[in-house]
Every structure is written in C-alpha cells, then in structure tokens.
C-alpha cells in the first residue's frame, strides 16, 4: 500500500538482530529453487516465478477519517456510536456485500490492484494443526497425515511454497507474521507464534523452515475454529494504524459442527468464526482460506457467499487440492491458484477506501497475544515469561482517538494427564468420548458426525451411537 515507509520502519524495528545479520533471499527466488514430487496428475517441476509489472504509484491522499458504528457482539466492547452519514454507509455496504469474481487472468487482477492504488499489501499466515489432518489426506495424500514430514513435501509445504511464489510479490517488506492453531496448546481458544517473542518470519523460506521444525514438537488436537487466528490478524491490523492486510489461512477442513446442532443453527465454533469474520469487515483486512486435503468444504463455500451483516465481502475460499489435481501444466495451476486467491482483492481494497477503513485505529478491537511456539511433548512453554506485546506500529496518518483496548484473555489449557487420555476423544483430545461407531471405537459427539471412516481402524462408519 502507499504507506510503505512507516510500515517498513515498524517492521524492521520489530525484526530481531537474527534477521538483520542474515538477509534472506526473496520468496520468489527461494521458491523457484524447490523441486516437487508427483501431486495428482502433474509433477512439481516449478518454472521461474511469474514476473509482476510494477504498478503505477498511487497518488491520491488517504481518505478522510470518521467514526464508524462498531459491530455489536457479546464478546466485543465497542465505543458509543456516532453519526456520520448512515445512509451513505448503508449504500456502500450493500454495494460491497457480495463481490463477484470478475477476472480471467492474473495480469488483470494485478492491473486492477494497481488501478485501485494497491501497490503492495501485508500478508499474515495461519496454519491449521487440528487432529483431522491425520485422516483428511486419505484420497489426496495416500492416507498419510497432511502434516507428515518426509522426503517429499506434504500438502501444507506445497501450499506454503506456492503461496510464497505467487502471493509474496504483493507483500511489501517480506516480513510475515505466521501463527498456528488447533493443536493441544491452543485448541479453539488461542494461536501460537512460529517464533519466540512473536518475531515475524523473514519471507516464506523461513515460514517453511519453521513449519518443519514445529510439526514434530506439537500434538494435533481441536476442535476447529478460525476465530482465534482472525482475532490475531485484527490485532495486527489495529496496531498497524489501519494498514491493509491479507490473512491467508491454510486448513484441512471446516469449522467443527456438533451432532447436536440443529439444521439452520450454528455450532459454538461456527458462531465465533462468523462473528470474527463480521468483525473483521470493520477493518482493512481480507481473508483467504486455502483448503488442503479431502475436505469437506460445503460450509466454507457457505461462508464465502452468505455471511450476512458485513461491511464488505471480506472472505474468499480457494480449494488448493482441487486446483493442483487438474491435468494441466504446473505453471497454469499456479496461475489459477493465485487468480482464485486474489480474485476479490481489488474490489475488497476499494471497499476499504470507500468505507473509510484505511489509515486509522478503531479503538474497540480486542488485543490478542499469541502463545510461544510449542515444545516437544505437545504443549507451549507454559513456564516461560509472558510473550511480549506486538511491536508498536508507526501509522502513516494520525490514529483514530481510542478509549483504550479491551483485552480479552484466553486461559491456557492445562496439559492432559496420561491417566485420562483413554477417556477423551482421540480427535479433539478435550471432550469426553460419548459417541460409538459400529466398529466399537469412540469419539465425542462434536467430532464423530463429520467422519466418514473410523480414525482408529479406518473402517467405514455406517452406525453412530450416542452414549449417555
């Protein structure tokens, strides 16, 4: 974006001496050196990264500041609303409530971004470490865990690399906040940073290397909720003074839905995720969900199309597995992925301008602190000092007056004792076993309904019995 200097000053000051003493190559040059195994119908022999033309400089002044009426949800503390022209705001919200996919090539998207004034953005990455990753690669990854680290890259490694190749060109300083969620230390309540003291990754090469180091240290768990990672992204945007960001979530499945959830109703995890997406639409933040593994993805497509009451359509779902399994050249598949991920960004960025969301703080966004990286044994370093706050941003325009942050604390779940492991659901590792399958194995009623095969013996599930 046009506020690169202040953003760069902040990010460089936040980046520790480690990165200052060892500059890393760009993500594009790094990714171009990677080689990949067979995935679907094509082999992963990457061509040189695509060349992005430098877009014209955006010369328009930043939009004027005015107050917005905050989204009112039980978990958020909002300041009093102010009158600022509600009719015009409602008109703009109707205009951007559903953004269509209007482009057929990556060049068209790049040109549209330039016309909208978006020379660059800031990427945030979130990665799903829930238990379902152990069986959602049954068809697409030869029945192995999607997080299996071996001689050939797993789907998460492939997605990280291709995102680094195709989307990193739109990140202005190559410093990427990266977080994990859904493991035994975070469940559906928190996120952990890929680096200690919440240091950002220096390009996607460090994202990939830290991913490989972290996976053996953690314990997959659940349930699945995207609310914590979206909350973390909102904290970053708020502390940047309202700079435009794109949150890329790489996940293997949709949000946990309990068997007790009635048709037309949302589970607690679904409701919190919807609330977070709606709240994020009050900020200059776009959300791209990249789906890896077998799915299912019907609820994510529903999130993409039909979440109500948003200031603008800020959510895009991309089925990575489906695109990468197509019988076409690898370069064409990469272009299709980048196009799918960026398709709505030009209109979303334009919406943040017209809704006057850029360049100011809201003052009512909950401040979230990430946990430190997990240690061997499946838990974060609980006895380590409290992680430091995110580094201070230097906004390019005076921040919106605030009344102080409402800090929402998330309790750290205690490590599960080995004596009680047998009584807990083997998927989420938090709920008691209260559903049995025909094979005799058991899970909880939240995890069981979404399974097609038993996670223990892999037998097809034909009978589900709720235990009382």
Curated annotation (Swiss-Prot):
Keywords: Abscisic acid signaling pathway, Cell membrane, Lipoprotein, Membrane, Metal-binding, Myristate, Nucleus, Stress response, Transferase, Ubl conjugation pathway, Zinc, Zinc-finger. One of its GO terms (cellular component) is nucleus. CDD domains: RING-HC_RGLG_plant. A zinc finger (RING-type) spans 425-458. Residues 1-89, 369-416 are annotated as: Disordered. Residues 12-45, 66-84 have a biased composition (Low complexity). It catalyses: S-ubiquitinyl-[E2 ubiquitin-conjugating enzyme]-L-cysteine + [acceptor protein]-L-lysine = [E2 ubiquitin-conjugating enzyme]-L-cysteine + N(6)-ubiquitinyl-[acceptor protein]-L-lysine. N-myristoylated. It holds the Pfam family zf-C3HC4_3. Ubiquitously expressed. GO terms for molecular function: ubiquitin protein ligase activity; ubiquitin-protein transferase activity; zinc ion binding. A lipid is attached at residue 2 (N-myristoyl glycine). GO terms for biological process: abscisic acid-activated signaling pathway; auxin metabolic process; cytokinin metabolic process; negative regulation of response to water deprivation; protein K63-linked ubiquitination. It is a lipid-anchor. Residues 122-342 form the VWFA domain. Residues 46-65 have a biased composition (Pro residues). The keyword Nucleus applies. It is found in: Cell membrane; Nucleus. Its EC number is 2.3.2.27. It is an enzyme of class 2 (transferase). E3 ubiquitin-protein ligase that mediates the formation of 'Lys-63'-linked ubiquitin chains. Regulates apical dominance by acting on the auxin transport proteins abundance. Mediates ubiquitination and subsequent proteasomal degradation of ERF053 in response to drought stress. Acts as a negative regulator of drought stress response. This is E3 ubiquitin-protein ligase RGLG2. The lineage of its organism: Eukaryota, Viridiplantae, Streptophyta, Embryophyta, Tracheophyta. The gene is RGLG2.
């Amino acid at each position: 974006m046009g506020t690169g200097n202040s953003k760069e000053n902040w990010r460089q000051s936040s980046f520790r001496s480690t990165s200052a003493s060892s500059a890393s190559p760009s993500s594009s040059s790094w990714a171009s050196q990677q080689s990949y195994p067979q995935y679907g119908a094509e082999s992963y022999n990457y061509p040189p990264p695509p060349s992005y033309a430098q877009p014209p400089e955006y010369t328009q002044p930043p939009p004027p500041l005015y107050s917005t009426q905050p989204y009112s949800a039980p978990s958020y503390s909002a300041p009093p609303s102010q009158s600022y022209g509600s009719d015009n705001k409602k008109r703009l919200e109707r205009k951007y409530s559903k953004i269509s996919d209007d482009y057929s090539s990556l060049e068209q998207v790049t040109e549209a971004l330039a016309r909208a004034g978006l020379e660059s953005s800031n990427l945030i990455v979130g990665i799903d470490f829930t238990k379902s990753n152990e069986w959602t690669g049954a068809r697409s990854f030869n029945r192995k865990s999607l997080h299996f680290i071996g001689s050939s890259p797993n789907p998460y490694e492939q997605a990280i690399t291709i995102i680094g190749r195709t989307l990193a060109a739109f990140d202005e300083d190559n410093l990427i906040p990266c977080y994990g969620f859904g493991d035994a230390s975070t469940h559906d309540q928190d996120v952990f940073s890929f680096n200690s003291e919440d240091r950002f990754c220096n390009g996607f090469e460090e994202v990939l290397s830290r991913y490989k180091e972290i996976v053996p240290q953690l314990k997959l768990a659940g349930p699945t909720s995207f609310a914590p990672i979206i909350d973390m992204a909102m904290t970053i945007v708020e502390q940047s003074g309202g700079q435009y960001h794109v949150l890329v979530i790489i996940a293997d499945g949709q949000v946990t839905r309990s068997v007790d959830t009635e048709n037309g109703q949302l589970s607690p995890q679904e409701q919190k995720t919807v609330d977070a997406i709606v709240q994020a639409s009050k900020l200059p933040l776009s959300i791209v969900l990249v789906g890896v593994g077998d799915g299912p993805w019907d609820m994510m497509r529903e999130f993409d199309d039909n979440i109500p009451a948003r200031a603008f359509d800020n959510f895009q779902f991309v089925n990575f597995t489906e695109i990468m399994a197509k019988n076409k050249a690898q370069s064409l598949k990469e272009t299709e992925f980048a196009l799918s991920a960026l398709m709505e960004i030009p209109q979303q960025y334009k919406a943040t301008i017209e809704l006057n969301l850029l360049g100011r703080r809201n003052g009512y966004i909950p401040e979230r602190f990430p946990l430190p990286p997990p240690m061997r044994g499946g838990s974060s370093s609980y006895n380590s000092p409290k992680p430091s706050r995110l580094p201070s941003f230097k906004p390019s325009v005076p921040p919106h007056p605030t009344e102080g942050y409402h800090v929402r604390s998330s309790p750290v779940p205690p490590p599960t004792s080995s004596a009680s492991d047998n009584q807990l659901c083997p998927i989420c590792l938090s709920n008691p076993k209260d559903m049995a399958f025909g094979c005799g194995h058991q899970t909880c009623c939240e995890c069981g309904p979404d399974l097609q095969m038993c996670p223990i013996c892999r037998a097809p599930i034909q009978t589900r019995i709720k235990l009382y």
